[in-house]
Design a protein with these regions (language model features):
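Amphipathic alpha-helical segments
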Residues: 65-81, 140-151
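Short, structured motif recognition centered on aromatic/hydrophobic residues
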Residues: 57-61, 73, 101-109, 118, ...
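Vicinal oxygen chelate
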Residues: 1-68, 83-87, 92-107, 118-141, 144-192
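N-terminal domain-onset segments
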Residues: 40, 45-77
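Glycine-rich, mobile lid/loop segments that gate access to catalytic sites or pores
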Residues: 114
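Surface-exposed beta-strand edges and their flanking turn/coil or helix-capping segments
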Residues: 76, 118-122, 147, 169
Length: 192
């Protein structure tokens, strides 16, 4: 028997467009809700809120899936372009955007049994919402505010290269239910 989230992930590869949209919308809602409760206090800090494009932040929910699921979802959605993930991250990714604002990144390990973050997540938890991504205008400054004012340490000591030339850092944030949520802050490449 599969979990409701497993069924939603499977429905992303449905030929029925309304079923696919309903699944994407629900996965997006679940990701936003999980992250929203974990980062609620961030919006009280005016500079951080502005850096994260508050009060209406650009949010993408990252869904980690096995390679076969990745292929099925990609084919069912018109074979979207693979984004350029740095090789050291051992991941493949494509983006899906749906009506009503649902944005998903579908992620998998580049190599079965790999050693990257996605492979480790899949080995430990199976398919699911792996991260929630917030677009940010300055990841370095946001990271500094999170460290100084919220005592939230970044996963990496420095901002690093992300997919398609973005700059990223990650934060493992405690949620009110005692769990943890992986938050990615990403900064779009400058148009030089």
């Amino acid at each position: 028997m599969s979990s409701p989230l497993s069924q939603l992930i499977a429905d992303l590869s449905s030929a029925d467009e309304s079923k696919k949209l309903a699944a994407a919308s629900e996965i997006y809602r679940l990701g936003r809700a999980t992250a929203g409760s974990a980062v609620a206090g961030w919006w009280t800090e005016s500079e951080l809120s502005a850096l994260l494009l508050g009060p209406s932040p650009a949010i993408t929910v990252g869904v980690a899936v096995q390679r076969d699921t990745f292929s099925r979802i990609r084919i069912a959605n018109g074979t979207p372009r693979l984004v350029g993930v740095p090789p050291d991250q051992d991941a493949e990714e494509f983006e899906l955007e749906f009506p009503e604002g649902a944005a998903l990144d579908i992620l998998t390990a580049r190599e079965p049994g790999g050693s990257g973050a996605i492979a480790k997540y899949l080995a430990k938890f199976g398919e699911g919402i792996q991260q929630v991504e917030y677009r940010c205008t300055n990841v370095d400054r946001a990271s500094q505010i999170l460290k100084e004012k919220f005592k939230v340490a970044s996963v990496y000591p420095e901002t690093r290269a992300g997919a398609d030339g973005t700059r990223v850092n990650f934060f493992l944030v405690k949620s009110p239910d005692g769990g943890k949520v992986l938050i990615e802050l990403y900064e779009l490449p400058s148009r030089a």
